C-alpha cells in the first residue's frame, strides 16, 4: 500500500505550465550627434516628466482590435517610461549645445529656464502598424518678474512597426521618442532665441 501511495506523488491534477522569462527593454534614446555646449551661458532645469493617466506601469502597451489596451506582464520597460523619457530629454538637450548645462531638480546651479513635461501617449497600435508617442512640454523663463512661459506644446510622433512582435514594438517606441525629442529640441531652440 505504501508503494502505491509513493507512486501517486508524481501524479498531479494541475497542468504543467512552462516558465516564461520576463524581458525588460531599455528605453535609452540618445541624440545622434553631440554639439559643443557654451562654457558661459544659459542653464536649463528639467523637472520630472509626469506619466499621463494609465502610463505609470512598465509593461509594454499595445492596442487590441476592439480598442482596448493590453499591458503585457512579460514584456516590459526596464524603468517606467516617464522616468526614462525624463532622463532621455535631459541627455538629449545636454547634447544639443543649446545650454551650458542641463540639470535635474536638486541641482545647486541657478537655472534661467525650466522645462516641465507629461508623457501623454505611449502605445503601439498593431492594427495601424505604428507606435505612437505624445509628450506635452512647457518651457518657462524664470529670469523676468513675473515668470514668462516661452513654449507650451504637445509633440507627437508615429513610427511604423516592422512587425507586431514585442522587439519590433520596443524599437518603434524608441524611434518615436527620438523623433519627439528632435522636434522638441527645435521648438526649444526657437523659443529661447
Enumerate the language-model features and the residues they cover.
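Short secondary-structure boundary motifs at beta->alpha junctions and helix caps
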Residues: 68-76, 144-183
